[in-house]
Amino acid sequence: MQACAACAKAKRKCSRQSPACLRCRSRGLDCQYPAKRPSRWVLMPDAPPETSSEEYSPPRLDVETAFRGLDPLLSLDEEMTHAQLSSWFTSIHTWNTVYSERLKTDAFSSYDLDGYVRKVRGWLAEWVQTGSNPFIHRQLYSVRFPRSIQDAYMCLSCYLNKTPANEQLIIRLVEEHSQGLLNEHGFDTAGSLVLRGQSNGLELMDHIARVQALFIYQFIGLFEDKASSHPVTQSRNDVLLAWTKEMVSAAATTVPSGVRDILASSEPGKYYGKELIQLLWHSWIVSETVRRTWNAMATMLGLFGFVKYGRTAPCPGGMMFTTQIGVWEAKSATEWLEICSSRSVGLMQVAEACELLYSAECKQINEFATTTLELTYGQERVQEYIK
């Protein structure tokens, strides 16, 4: 889908949503898209036409085009590949990390920092209690639960239930498991020296598990453990950032062909009809988890840098994620498909999410988006718009 006439004329980025893009809705503009040949599916040709003299560029398949009119109970044409149907959340630009001046925390305060710590602590407790939270999907580890995240789950559960009598014992447990994770992947005690390459050959689920595990250990060490040896804990921030970059890179090359690690059956073969819908859903879960995990990591490191170095602290940047409520919470592939095919899911960059504050969709954003906006633009300002 091309940009609408209003965005094209103003030379502004268009969200290409139907019936009206986000910019037009927020400004009350008449949103008109260029006429196009009606088609239920947009197939990507194997090669450019021989008569064409122009540079060939395969059409990008967005979520509205991909799922419009699809009955989830019908079998899909097996020629419709996973890569084509998933391109709205797996194309190259969806993995970009973007830094914007908007991400400077000009409205940030110590009150917001305390709110962030409470929020993330609540999310981690939610994961321990229910098996999911806004950046760890309930389906993610339903089939395969890597040892690294098992250890983090155990340490986190102990930490959340600590008492004054056993607190130091549990802090030691967290520290030893954190160091054990680094040792397993070839890092020294400070986490600053690579001893041997251990990232090569890691499967995507192992990338995700070790990043989320180290995130948990770092959160406890940086914000929860008042007696922590901060120089050692801080030195591991660089490892966390490096691992997260490797995770994103692995996802960008793996997800487009389909992620089967969290499917009940991982037998190779053709996927179409209901099986293809299930594969699409699980591939989206993994890709969305990767991007939300990046944003959670970037926020934690950014805020810690803000506390330590002030407003000159570097920011890792943000990634795209779905901002509308209901998509992440869908309990089945069919429910997920119905949501994606009937309305906008609000897939956008963190740096662009501020536009939601001025749109009618503001009251429909999910918890992860709300927290992201509060940390970027201040809780008081965001809550005024949401109310």
Q: What are these regions, as identified by a protein language model?
A:
Residues 36-54:
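Intrinsically disordered, low-complexity regulatory segments enriched in Ser/Pro/Gln/Gly
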Residues 131-140, 151-161, 179-247, 302-303:
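Hydrophobic/aromatic-rich effector regions of fungal transcription factors
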Residues 61-70, 76-133, 138-146, 162-178, ...:
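C-terminal effector modules of eukaryotic transcription factors
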Residues 6-9, 16, 23-26, 167-175, ...:
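Intrinsically disordered, low-complexity segments that are common in secreted/host-exposed effector
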